[in-house]
Amino acid sequence: MGRAGISSDQQTSRLFNYTILQLDKINAYYGESHILRDVSFTIDSGEVVCLMGRNGVGKTTTLKVLTGLLPARSGRMMFDGKDVTKAPTDQRARSGLACVPQGREILPHLTVRENLLLGFWARSDKPNGTVEKTAFDEVYHLFPKLTQILNRPGGVLSGGEQQQLAIGRALLSNPKLLLLDEPTEGIQPSIVDQIEDVIIGFKQQRRFAILLVEQGLHFAARLAEKYVVMAKGAVVVAGKSTELTAEQVKQYLTV
């Protein structure tokens, strides 16, 4: 059994490079307002992709479509080889899609440990006690502060503590793709550095893919293997970080 309770078969399948997510001409609306316009991009297994753009261009809306919170009016979403365009949110989560939203969505009246358990219970496999201990130990290794506050209600935590909890909870679901919506926003610099180190570690392990919504090019440049840049609800630039210049990306980030 691998780290964080990943089965040997699952580990083997992730060693090979394949497309874990494919969006094909996704269109989404709020009421009659056309928000996403023919959004198309792919993410490979183990890849770190940064979704970038100014405020209001559709980045968070894209994540809502990915998680099923907002249905696409047209287009197709393939996840891990299956068409999940019409799949409900809980089915997507069980299939390995985990999200840390901008608001973190920590349940305020549950303790830190209870919040973490919600992530673990979302797993699609049937882990035993050894797997549970291994998975929790890894989260505590990544975010040791959590071990000191396990019995505190989530609502009394600082922003940085809540972000660590939210990421830890998502990791316990054993994701194939982790969505992070501006994980460093409003967080103290020391926690930002810690989150960056965690992402770099997962990038090196290539255990799962990460889609990172980020506005800061400096932070994104240290992590991204691919950029997907949006403007006015559409993808305007997409490519490997080795193929795009900073100026090609920056022109769509500055006002």
Predicted regions and their residues:
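Helix-to-loop junction immediately C-terminal to a conserved catalytic motif
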Residues: 67
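Conserved ABC ATPase signature
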Residues: 153-157, 161
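Helical segment within the ABC ATPase nucleotide-binding domain
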Residues: 193-207
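Catalytic Walker B motif of ABC-type/P-loop ATPase nucleotide-binding domains
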Residues: 178-182
